[in-house]
Amino acid sequence: MYFLNQLIFQDVSVMSVDKREDMSRSFQKCLNLRYPIIQAPMAGVTTIEMAAKACIAGAIASLPLSHLDFRKVNDIEKLKLMVSQFRDQVADESLEGNLNLNFFCHDIVDKPTDLQTANWAKLYRKSMNVPIDMNEIKFDNGNVSFKAFEKENALQDFFQYLSDGFRPKIISFHFGHPSKSTIEYLQKIGILIFVTATSVREVRLLARLGINGIVCQGYEAGGHRGNFLVNDPKDDENLSTVQLVKRTVDELAEMKNKGLIHATPFVIAAGGIMDSKDISYMLSQQADAVQVGTAFLGCSESNASKNFSSPFTRETTTKMVNIISGKPARTISTPFIEKVIANFQGEELPPYGYMYSAFKQVRKKYPELANFILAGQGFQNVQSGITTDKKIETMGARLKIDGK
């Protein structure tokens, strides 16, 4: 699979617009795809069935792996089982490699302090008006960072599996990037590295690292925002998807012309992309492909499909909040979300991973009260009951590339 690197790393930065638009076809050809679409790796939502249907339909399938902890002996076996089930459902050796394994790569944080957990309990008791027994809440880190695996030398079995066994075409990272040595090793064995960016600063850093694809996550995107150079949401420029794509294309072209990078990574648009018109527009703005998430929330294979069995009113909106999980995330605005926002007074809360784990325990006990429905702008147009493959085929069949 090493040939993929040779095909992907093309000099596209100084192409004309027409030639640059051909990159969507190059993306498809290099990765053996029918459509320039990546099914987003939505933690807690994406299922193996969804990924398999996306792959069969001709898109890149994605499996979110933020729940795995390679420091534990059995978790590499969990990964192997997931991949095995995916391959069995795809049942086509020519397609099964069209897979993206996604990891969270945030900075390693300390365990929460007593003050942080006490503030959290006070906020939730006031917002939910229910008794919360702190003796029943465990502040465990439910989302271990890939950086922790690197730091503790816990990647040997994973790398061995990739080297000797199944190799996905893409491994991607959210909330940050792995070490240069990890990137180079994975590329050497023929795996493409994609990383999420939300700003031009992040794009510039990732391009210098030599990654293969930049997932440009616009502010309208649902789920957790993948920024890693901005710690305070007030410092986030909140670029829309199209503005981030345009500025990324320009930045990469300038870096290439100045000799700062030797090859230009693919530009992947992500955020607010709901149908073929949205996809066609992003491709016309020189994106090489798109990553679609919210549009699949109502699909029959989605773990979130029950939330979309009945249509939302047009008045229902989304909010970007960082006080549920500990990181900014776009969620559907519900009475619970509004109460938490109203009651929060800037108190210090537990860090991401620990706070999110505590919330999930409360949600399990009070599912009707603690609802955190991650979705992007345009979620009102989510189709309910459609299968993932049918959704992709419908979007793909109506695509317009180069005006055709």
UniProtKB/Swiss-Prot annotation:
Per the record's keyword annotation, is Lyase included, yes or no? no
Q: Which domain of life is it from?
A: Eukaryota
Q: Which Gene3D superfamilies match?
A: Aldolase class I (3.20.20.70)
Q: Which EC number applies?
A: 1.13.12.16
Role according to the record: Catalyzes the oxidation of alkyl nitronates to produce the corresponding carbonyl compounds and nitrites.
Residues bound to substrate: 224
Which of the seven top EC classes does this enzyme belong to? oxidoreductase
Q: Which reaction does it catalyse?
A: ethylnitronate + O2 = chemical entity + acetaldehyde + nitrite + H(+)
Binding annotation for FMN: 41-43, 270-272, 293-294
| One GO term describing the cellular component | cytoplasm
Query: What further fact does the record state?
Result: Present with 172 molecules/cell in log phase SD medium.
Q: Name one Pfam family in it.
A: NMO
Q: What are the disulphide bonds in this sequence?
A: none
- The name under which this protein is listed is Putative nitronate monooxygenase
Cofactors needed by this protein, per the record, are: FMN
According to the record, cofactor stoichiometry and binding are noted as:
Binds 1 FMN per subunit.
Q: What residues make up the catalytic site?
A: 224 (proton acceptor)
